[in-house]
Amino acid sequence: MAHIRADEITSILRQEIENYERAIDVSEVGSVISVGDGIARIHGLEKVMAGELIEFPHDVAGIAMNLEEDQVGAVLLGDYTLIKEGDEVKRTKRIMSVPVGEALIGRVVNALGQPIDGKGPINATQFNPIERLAPGVVARQPVKEPMMTGIKAVDAMIPIGRGQRELIIGDRQTGKTAIALDAIINQKGGDMICIYVAIGQKRSTVAQVVKTLEDNGAMEYSIVVVASASDPAPMQYLAPFSGCAIGEYFRDSKRHALCIYDDLSKHAAAYREISLLLRRPPGREAFPGDVFYLHSRLLERAAKLNNEHGAGSLTALPFIETQAGDVSAYIPTNVISITDGQIFLEADLFNSNQRPAINVGISVSRVGGNAQTKAMKSIAGGLRLDLAQYRELAAFAQFGSDLDKSSQAQLNRGRHLVEILKQDQYQPLPLEKQIMIIWAGTKGYLDDIPVELCRKFEAELYRFSENAHRPVLDEIKTKKALDPDLTAKVKGIVEEFKGRFMAENAPAKAHA
């Protein structure tokens, strides 16, 4: 018989007692009453918060949206077919958050901040709640720095400033996304982080956008947030808020971010779907009563912070898709009233080969003028006036009236200006080149050149300026203002180049 050592047993027991931890896992639970169409009704979560993240079985998450007397209505962020009646549901006691920070740059993520580009996990150390209060009046300062898009028509006549909300509105297939991509590509070499949020779009379209950004080297400073057409409505509803939370990280860390929401019409439709399934009362066009607040609380988070808060900025470019140019529908009028201006794109202009198809007559930027560079401001006023007079005369000339010489000259000038405002896709122009061509156009140097040669004149003027007068372009870039001395240099370049151009293209002119 083995000898039993009492001291050894005592020490083992003492060691076990010391290592024993008394921990009770307490969690508030409820049970699923019914589930369907991405909505679950839950009984038992009495202390749940509005917008709180809820844990369902099979790693499915949900958000509490309807807090009723005897039940909670929650939207599911995963496959709702895995959930059944009677399943246990747990509170997390935290509001829905997404990962933010440098680790997301160059990545494609879903509305929950999870990577979907196959490049491995994102090692984010910080999380931001998707719903946050917008900065107050005291924390802001007026928009004063330009956010150059590289598009002549926008930077000259509808300028966008850092911290502004500028709506891009138009029918489908009028070039809305192209303007946003140009704006992203134009930030290359700058200090801006760009976030592109795709809401309810085809996956093939999003893949094309990502490829375009990669081909132009823009993914190095961009983040793409995707809630595609095949994703559930709650994911489409969350996507812009997630994109905004990611942008706010850069805004609050004394940096600058641009957030593009493509588009908020589909976002409103997803919210309408959720609201109707949650049995909320419908209003105009079956949208819920708080659809205005849905977009206003999102877009108000774009801001230019004051110096005490780091002077960072978040610029928003929301998109709205209209039906047959109807801007008086519910969602378009809502978003127009929330934003600081709008860029109207028209199908007729697009089809008549004027691209970007911006109707500068009804497009406006309410605060961007304060952010415009002095150089652009000095020449853009004349451009807008000339185009306004041209549109008025063009409408009058349709009646076949005989026009006097000054009116004919005005029509001719307008035709040339419309031509130089055309621009190829994904070819954003730096400020100095925009200044050169717009100055030449508004001062009448293109008036005697055939309209069909305007684009050739423009391309060759850029080449000539770069090769023979690079210091002048650099001076415009650094000064950002046209003083008399610099204006004289620009005039000299344009006159010298025009002489050469007219000599080379004299046969074409005579033929024209």
From Swiss-Prot:
Topology in the lipid bilayer: Peripheral membrane protein
Binding site for ATP: G170, D171, R172, Q173, T174, G175, K176, T177
Protein location: Cell inner membrane
GO CC terms of this entry: plasma membrane; proton-transporting ATP synthase complex
Site entry (Required for activity), positions: S363
Reactions this protein catalyses: ATP + H2O + 4 H(+)(in) = ADP + phosphate + 5 H(+)(out)
Keywords: ATP synthesis, ATP-binding, Cell inner membrane, Cell membrane, CF(1), Hydrogen ion transport, Ion transport, Membrane, Nucleotide-binding, Translocase, Transport
Source species, domain of life: Bacteria
Main location: membrane
InterPro entries in the cross-refs: ATP_synth_asu-like_sf (IPR023366), ATP_synth_asu_C (IPR000793), ATP_synth_asu_C_sf (IPR038376), ATP_synth_F1_a_nt-bd_dom (IPR033732), ATP_synth_F1_asu (IPR005294), ATPase_a/bsu_AS (IPR020003), ATPase_F1/V1/A1_a/bsu_N (IPR004100), ATPase_F1/V1/A1_a/bsu_N_sf (IPR036121)
GO molecular-function term, one example from the UniProt record: ADP binding
The enzyme's E.C. designation: 7.1.2.2
Function: Produces ATP from ADP in the presence of a proton gradient across the membrane. The alpha chain is a regulatory subunit.
Subunit structure: F-type ATPases have 2 components, CF(1) - the catalytic core - and CF(0) - the membrane proton channel. CF(1) has five subunits: alpha(3), beta(3), gamma(1), delta(1), epsilon(1). CF(0) has three main subunits: a(1), b(2) and c(9-12). The alpha and beta chains form an alternating ring which encloses part of the gamma chain. CF(1) is attached to CF(0) by a central stalk formed by the gamma and epsilon chains, while a peripheral stalk is formed by the delta and b chains.
Record-linked PANTHER family: ATP SYNTHASE SUBUNIT ALPHA, MITOCHONDRIAL
Family: Belongs to the ATPase alpha/beta chains family.
Protein name, entry field: ATP synthase subunit alpha
Native organism: Solibacter usitatus (strain Ellin6076)
